[in-house]
């Protein structure tokens, strides 16, 4: 989370499933919806989740007790149907996902880089 705050990133894109074919592919780096979790000096709140057919959209709020206090909203886009090997069979899902990411990034004043 230090890198996210250092770069002032507001958009995270994840294309990996957490588990595929019974194997862990990614460790969950966010708390369940409505809950907070501490990551070192940072506290991350998973404020909201919207689940769609091919992806999940989350809104995080990251804070840090500092002088001055730090608070940032982060948008997490998680594409859930990318296969372990190859590419998705339906490009429409990927294109819709990319459209949502681009719209989100454009709507922010100073979004920083997209973190993938």
Curated annotation (Swiss-Prot):
Origin: domain of life: Eukaryota
What Gene Ontology terms for biological process does this UniProt record contain?
cell differentiation; intracellular signal transduction; mitotic cell cycle
Looking at the record, the residues that make up the Tyrosine-protein phosphatase domain are: 1-116
Alphabetized SUPFAM superfamilies for the sequence: (Phosphotyrosine protein) phosphatases II
Q: Which GO terms describe its molecular function?
A: non-membrane spanning protein tyrosine phosphatase activity; phosphotyrosine residue binding
Which parts of the sequence bind substrate? 84
Q: Which InterPro entries match?
A: Non-rcpt_Tyr_Phosphatase, Prot-tyrosine_phosphatase-like, PTP_cat
State the GO CC annotations: cytoplasm
Gene3D superfamilies noted in UniProt: Protein tyrosine phosphatase superfamily
Q: What class of enzyme is it?
A: hydrolase
Keywords assigned by UniProt, alphabetized: Hydrolase, Protein phosphatase
Q: What is its EC number?
A: 3.1.3.48
The record's catalysed reaction(s) read: O-phospho-L-tyrosyl-[protein] + H2O = L-tyrosyl-[protein] + phosphate
Name of a matching Pfam family: Y_phosphatase
Give the record's family classification: Belongs to the protein-tyrosine phosphatase family.
Q: What is this protein called?
A: Tyrosine-protein phosphatase 14
Please give the organism: Styela plicata
